[in-house]
């Protein structure tokens, strides 16, 4: 039964990757979206002993994009950070969003880091180092950001610090 569940999960993941709808781009408050995600995960942060910080410059950032798709990307990156911090006594996750000529969003954690030999592979569909999950998450995130004419990269990853960087046009 476990194997059939994995096949179903794989099929569902493949369907998501291959049928990603075109983004419905509308003006929305990125700041409000980030605050909603903080609220959504606040119980998980508390339960996992994770300190979460959110900063936006300017205080309110508006952007054009598919709010649902971008929320999914941010939620996936936050959940990955939380998984990286499992068992850590003083976990920290921060999001720093900035608007100037473009929008940049950095999601940072103080987890173990991603080994250099895996940093290119983590965006490949179905690649995973976890016992659970399909390995589709980061690939899907990268594809969604690309559909918004943006880029998702690992800005830095060392033991004690990983930063995922999203760069998008206004």
Where are these regions (language model features)?
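Conserved catalytic submotifs in the C-terminal HATPase_c
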Residues: 46, 51-61, 98-100
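Short helix N-cap motif at coil->helix boundaries in the Bergerat
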Residues: 30, 113-121
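Conserved micro-motifs of the catalytic ATP-binding
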Residues: 20-23, 62-65, 129
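A conserved beta-strand-to-alpha-helix junction within the catalytic ATP-binding
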Residues: 1, 24-39, 96
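Short beta-strand/loop element within the Bergerat-fold HATPase_c
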Residues: 90-101
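Detector for a conserved hydrophobic position within an alpha-helical segment of the HATPase_c
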Residues: 145-146
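Short alpha-helical Gxxx[C/S/T] motif in the catalytic ATP-binding
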Residues: 137, 141
